[in-house]
């Protein structure tokens, strides 16, 4: 499983402290919502500058980690 901590951070100064992909203002929540709505990974990558292929599995790993706790 991918180590989501390499790609995701929380900072109270960025997006009200929601988990975001490092160096961006793209929230994990946003990506997970789009995936749940059926948006393809490639569409997300094409439409959101700063989003990289490794961010998709990192978002899923983060969600799995949160659900385990």
Question: Can you name each region flagged by the protein language model?
Answer:
Residues 2-42:
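A short, structured beta-strand/loop element
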Residues 26-69:
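Long, charge-rich, low-complexity alpha-helical segments
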């Amino acid at each position: 499983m991918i180590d989501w901590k390499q790609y995701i951070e929380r900072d109270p100064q960025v997006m009200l402290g929601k988990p975001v992909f490092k160096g961006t203002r793209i929230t994990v929540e946003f990506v997970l919502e789009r995936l749940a709505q059926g948006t393809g990974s490639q569409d997300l990558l094409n439409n959101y500058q700063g989003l990289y292929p490794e961010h998709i599995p990192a978002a899923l790993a983060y969600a799995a980690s949160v659900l385990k706790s």
